[in-house]
Amino acid sequence: MAATEAVHHIHLQNFSRSLLETLNGQRLGGHFCDVTVRIREASLRAHRCVLAAGSPFFQDKLLLGHSEIRVPPVVPAQTVRQLVEFLYSGSLVVAQGEALQVLTAASVLRIQTVIDECTQIIARARVPNTPAPAPLPPPVPPPLAPAQLRHRLRHLLAARPPGHPNAAHSRKQRQPARLQLPAPPAPIKAEGPDAEPALTAAPEDRGEEDDDEETDEETDAEEGEGGGGGPGEGQAPPAFPDCAGGFLTTAADSAREDPPASTGITDYGGAGRDFLRGTGVTEDVFPDSYVSAWHEESSGGPESCPVETSAPPDCALAGPRPTGVKTPGPPVALFPFHLGAPGPPAPTPPTPSGPAPAPPPTFYPTLQPDAAPSAQLGETQAVPAAPAAQATAISGTPVRAPGGQGAEQPAYECSHCRKTFSSRKNYTKHMFIHSGEKPHQCAVCWRSFSLRDYLLKHMVTHTGVRAFQCAVCAKRFTQKSSLNVHMRTHRPERAPCPACGKVFSHRALLERHLAAHPAP
């Protein structure tokens, strides 16, 4: 019987990667490229086997025998070029502002891995960072009576064994945490000769002050407060940071006095001595008036605690606007990702009581003063327009309002339905309704649209990005209209049915219910 022949397995770790790198080098050199990808006016050469393996869009085109593939012009050519390079290299660098364009291009080419990654990038960027739950404050023990305080301190001071002067700093015999005090930091004087001393803020107050953006003068004042640390200028902060708002600040002025006479209590060195000095220790560690001063510490005067003033209102919403200046609208994006409920509307600019100011310079040609008024501009009297002005208005030229009252707004009139528009962009969009032209086509389902904006909104149905979130229940939707319908469920007012008592969130739903309701 013949011996079993040995079998050797040869496995190269990075063979696939090196093969793609070789193909990418051939593509850059223009060797063996058998397909052309065109996007707008740009074009690039590639290998059909790589494109078909990485993109179902290219695979469907190549199965039909196309040697030249034209990508729908919904995204820039540079974005498509990046995705083609991704098919060769497997790596893609996406900036935060370009994630939406890359997502749209990947949806057209149906590259699912890029769609998933860009969806996560957009979701992380659009969702507001939920603040971490604030840590629970440490339990504050109930205030003790003066006699109990004296007994507690005597017990702590007597816990030190005799004959060990440095036992408080020993690692084997540790004293309570409040008696192991580090050396006080070097005093830092407040900046400037006119800086007023103030008490050191508590750690939690210091954290709240750091969250607010203040001016340079206020920042310098906070640095002075952090360095001052005591009631006097240039004085070292108290040795007990946990007791900064407690009993040490009530008798900090007595820290400069001489040490009291010995009362039989074991003398401590270093921080322990400063601790006993700062509280003015006698035979009774704390006087009877100590408790009232402790409780009144939180209700300090306006000089001891700086009062934070609220930030001034936004300059875009405060004060009247000059006549003729339009309120800036929301930022325009490829997909309008507006999370939560919409913001408050901008206030209406007040009408000036004096004479109307001169209208701002316009870039539209001056027309006859008796031009036909627009129904959407708010005029009540109609002045007969000249034939030349009517012909100009029908052709889409701006029409001015009669008279010189207020700012002159241009208007465009549709020659088919006589509808007027205040901007050329809206007028151009409206003309697609009458022409029936739909030049923008979805590369996934081949549905056509008259405007590129409609195509971009339609692409959300393929990408699955739920960019619109309810501010009440955090539910997400793909379209703004779906969010608006959902917001009706959170309205406090309800429309009850008089017959069966069923409530509805909208009166239209109630009317539909009443129409289908059986007659009594």
UniProtKB/Swiss-Prot annotation:
Q: What are the GO cellular component annotations? A: nucleus
Q: Name one GO biological process term.
A: nervous system development
Q: Which residues form the BTB domain?
A: 33-96
Picking any one GO molecular function of the record gives:
sequence-specific double-stranded DNA binding
Q: Where is this region: Disordered?
A: 182-272, 337-372
User: What keywords does the record list, in alphabetical order?
Assistant: DNA-binding, Metal-binding, Neurogenesis, Nucleus, Repeat, Transcription, Transcription regulation, Zinc, Zinc-finger
Q: What does this protein do?
A: May be involved in transcriptional regulation. In the central nervous system, may play a role in glial cell differentiation.
Question: What is the protein's name according to its record?
Answer: Zinc finger and BTB domain-containing protein 45
What domain of life is recorded for the organism? Eukaryota
What is the gene called? Zbtb45
Pro residues biased stretches: 342-363
The UniProt regions of compositional bias labelled Acidic residues, in chain numbering, are 206-225
**Could you tell me which PROSITE patterns the record lists for this protein?**
BTB (PS50097), ZINC_FINGER_C2H2_1 (PS00028), ZINC_FINGER_C2H2_2 (PS50157)
Annotated C2H2-type zinc fingers sit at 412-434, 440-462, 468-490, 495-517
Xref: PANTHER family: AGAP004733-PA (PTHR46105), ZINC FINGER AND BTB DOMAIN CONTAINING 45 (PTHR46105:SF22)
Q: What family is this protein classified in?
A: Belongs to the krueppel C2H2-type zinc-finger protein family.
InterPro entries recorded: BTB/POZ_dom (IPR000210), SKP1/BTB/POZ_sf (IPR011333), Znf_C2H2_sf (IPR036236), Znf_C2H2_type (IPR013087), ZnFinger_BTB_dom_contain (IPR050457)
Q: Which compartment or compartments is the protein found in?
A: Nucleus
